């Protein structure tokens, strides 16, 4: 430990103690909050089923920065590099298209064995795994419908894919001793004015009921469902809207996924957390950064990221909210994107843990909104960075921007050699 870091740490402890905050306790609490990193930042959502195929489903990864992962071994190596630069507990979020098999596997036939390498790798790296069926980038999703498809056979294919995915998810949880959160998102919708908005939603409702009909151990697997406002090519109508999934999660008591980019640009998911928690047992968060639309830019340490973290901490939702990330920027170094976004999420959680929430609640309850605002603003200037640097030190990760040197070295040695 450097003398400078130690001095800053001691001063920070004193400053926070003066407002009633135990920084050691804050760091212990931070270690209770894993962040689930998404594997698809590493290869622009290509996967291993058909890596040269087009990305569909109304989503886009823009940019052509060199060095993207082309295989499972490359993706895992890149992930290890990123993980080594991020302090504290982490998980990995996989999509079904990241299966490994020597022969082609139909999506409705995926099995735990196709993800065995991921499980062994997760064990070696002390990670939990989360999962997602991949209802996009496939010939049977080409017309924009999957679980809500009017064709019985196509709809059944996607139902079977999601059912198979649940068994993979349960396998993750059983093998790793921590439940896998499996999120169902489908791109189903229409580009232009839609006359019958009810029938597709009725089909989606019935399909989802069939998907979750198999009873699985909740210690191994958690179901989540995710809404969206619109996607490219589905601007006018999305079957799985916010109202649809809020009703579904409430009535079926599944987890509800809130994606920061899946709402109108004037809406924020931080304001939805406390409302949804009154009705659903769990929330899954996809923390992202929408720029004018669901662009999935790298997460910043901005007001909304901080507000999301503060909602989790202020209401003690540690055991009911699962924090995941969802962004994919192909215009910058992909490992750096992981590191920047994940570290920012963790910084926001730390800052929330360093807030004198009890004092602020008292001021609010007494109607002293002047003092509430004053303290909230003064809080921003307290030396949280020194606490963050100590946290990084204890987890053997770079405290400041030194991590970029490691990324550049890896880029020169490994990424630059990829065609």
Swiss-Prot record:
- Keywords associated with the record: Cytoplasm, Isomerase, Manganese, Metal-binding, Rhamnose metabolism
Protein's UniProt keywords contain DNA-binding: no
EC numbers for this chain: 5.3.1.14
Protein name in the entry: L-rhamnose isomerase
Q: A single GO CC term, please?
A: cytoplasm
Pathway annotation: Carbohydrate degradation; L-rhamnose degradation; glycerone phosphate from L-rhamnose: step 1/3
Q: Can you say where in the cell this protein is located?
A: Cytoplasm
Write down how the cofactor binds this protein: Binds 1 Mn(2+) ion per subunit.
The record describes its quaternary structure and partners as: Homotetramer.
Q: Where does Mn(2+) bind?
A: 262, 294, 296
Gene Ontology MF terms:
L-rhamnose isomerase activity; manganese ion binding
Summary of the function given for this chain in its UniProt record: Catalyzes the interconversion of L-rhamnose and L-rhamnulose.
What's one GO BP annotation on this UniProt entry? Answer: rhamnose catabolic process
Name the family the entry cites: Belongs to the rhamnose isomerase family.
List cofactor names only.
Mn(2+)
Q: Which InterPro entries match?
A: L-rhamnose_isomerase, Rhamnose_isomerase, Xyl_isomerase-like_sf
**Substrates-to-products reaction catalysed:** L-rhamnopyranose = L-rhamnulose
Query: Gene encoding it?
Result: rhaA
């Amino acid at each position: 430990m450097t003398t400078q870091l130690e001095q800053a740490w001691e001063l920070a402890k004193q400053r926070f103690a003066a407002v009633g905050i135990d920084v050691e306790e804050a760091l212990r609490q931070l270690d209770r909050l894993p962040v689930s990193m998404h594997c698809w930042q590493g290869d622009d959502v290509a996967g291993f089923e058909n890596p040269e195929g087009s990305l569909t489903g109304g989503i886009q990864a823009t940019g052509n920065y060199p060095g993207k992962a082309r295989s499972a071994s490359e993706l895992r190596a890149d992930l290890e590099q990123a993980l080594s630069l991020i302090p504290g507990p982490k998980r990995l979020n996989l999509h079904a298209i990241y299966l490994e098999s020597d022969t082609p596997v139909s999506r409705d036939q995926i099995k735990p064995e196709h993800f065995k390498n991921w499980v062994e790798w997760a064990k070696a790296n002390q990670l939990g795994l989360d999962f997602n069926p991949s209802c996009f980038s496939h010939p049977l999703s080409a017309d924009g419908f999957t679980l809500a498809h009017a064709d019985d056979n196509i709809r059944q294919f996607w139902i079977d894919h999601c059912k198979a995915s649940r068994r993979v998810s349960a396998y993750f949880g059983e093998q790793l001793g921590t439940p896998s959160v499996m999120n169902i998102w489908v791109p189903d919708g229409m580009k232009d004015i839609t006359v019958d908005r009810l029938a597709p939603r009725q089909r989606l409702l019935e399909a989802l009921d069939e998907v979750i009909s198999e009873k699985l151990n909740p210690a191994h697997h958690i179901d989540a469902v995710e809404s969206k406002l619109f996607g490219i090519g589905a601007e006018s109508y999305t079957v799985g809207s916010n109202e649809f999934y809020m009703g579904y999660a409430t009535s079926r008591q599944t987890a509800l996924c809130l994606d920061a980019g899946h709402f109108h640009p004037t809406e924020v998911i931080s304001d939805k957390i406390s409302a949804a928690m009154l009705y659903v047992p769990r929330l899954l968060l996809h923390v992202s950064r929408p720029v004018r639309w669901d662009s999935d830019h790298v997460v910043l340490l901005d007001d909304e990221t901080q507000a999301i973290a503060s909602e989790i901490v202020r209401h003690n939702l540690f055991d009911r909210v699962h924090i995941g990330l969802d962004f994919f920027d192909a215009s910058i170094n992909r490992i750096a994107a992981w590191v920047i976004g994940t570290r920012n999420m963790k910084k926001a959680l730390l800052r929330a843990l360093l807030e004198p929430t009890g004092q602020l609640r008292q001021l609010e309850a007494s109607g002293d909104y002047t003092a509430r605002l004053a303290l909230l603003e003064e809080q921003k200037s307290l030396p949280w960075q020194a606490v963050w640097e100590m946290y990084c030190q204890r987890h053997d990760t770079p405290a400041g921007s030194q991590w970029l040197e490691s990324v550049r070295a890896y880029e020169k040695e490994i990424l630059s050699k990829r065609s």
